[in-house]
Amino acid sequence: MRIELLLKGAYERLNFVSETAQLDAQLLLAHVLDVSTSYFYTWPEKQVSDDNIRVFDDLLSRREQGEPVAYLLGHQAFWSLELEVSPCTLIPRADTERLVEVALQVLEQTDQTPTTRILDLGTGTGAVALSLAAELPHSTVIGVDLIDGAVELAGRNATRNRIRNATFLQSSWFDALQEQAPFEVIVSNPPYIDPDDKHLSQGDVRFEPKSALIADNHGLADIEHIVATAPDFLAPQGYLIFEHGYDQAAAVREYLTTRGFTKVASFQDLGGNDRVTMGQWTQV
């Protein structure tokens, strides 16, 4: 079957389950054929073998069931990196790049040295940690995650992207970090979804690990814990920077202010929602 006909049928199948049906189909077929998507515009009349059609059909069926394209491909672009992904971690999303941007802005305003240390809590694929490490090659970045599989995955992503100034440890938040502190900046994209949120039964998140998505107290329990504990691991004048839910900024700002952080501020994502909040620890 010709590429153009195969893709046309795939668009029709995925159009009922995905808002990005055309892109999904092209990415999946490019993966099967080991070509770029531009190949389809250059060679639409090329024939696809029966074996490749069967593999493509299997991927389409899985996508029809809602399985995320990133899991089907096994990788996802984030910042300037190409990251391996797996069902043991969240899929890196564009909104989380805002967390990287804010952290870089903060670090640009500080006196960076070769001893500048950055901590990423709940690192998952290592997306945030590795993006910061890539942009700040003279810094030391440590990423931690509770899940051993995530720690191993983040390490592979460091190797894949030739990043040597980031290391990854297994830890439940700060538990294994006593000897690693202090840090000039602590960043985190923690679980922040309410366990009763209806969106957990919709879209890609149905296939992502719930432990990386949900938190008690309306999604704020892990954020509360991090805010309470972070000062013990921050350097003087250090910053704590979070990603959080679109409707949680006011609560996060209150937690930070009550704990004694200063320069508390929130930053919007691409959709105009307050998505990242930071505070500086100035107490001795």
Task: Tell me the role of every PLM-derived stretch.
Residues 98-199:
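Conserved SAM/SAH cofactor-binding pocket of Class I
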Residues 28, 66, 96, 128, ...:
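Residue-level signal for inorganic ion chemistry
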Residues 14, 107, 158, 230, ...:
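Conserved hydrophobic residues forming the short capping helix/wall of the S-adenosyl-L-methionine
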Residues 30-105:
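Conserved AdoMet
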Residues 217-281:
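Conserved Class I SAM-dependent methyltransferase catalytic core
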Residues 1-33, 38-41, 48:
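Non-catalytic accessory regions of SAM-dependent methyltransferases
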Residues 92, 120, 143, 215, ...:
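Conserved SAM-binding loop
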Residues 181, 192-222:
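Mobile active-site "lid"/loop adjacent to the S-adenosyl-L-methionine
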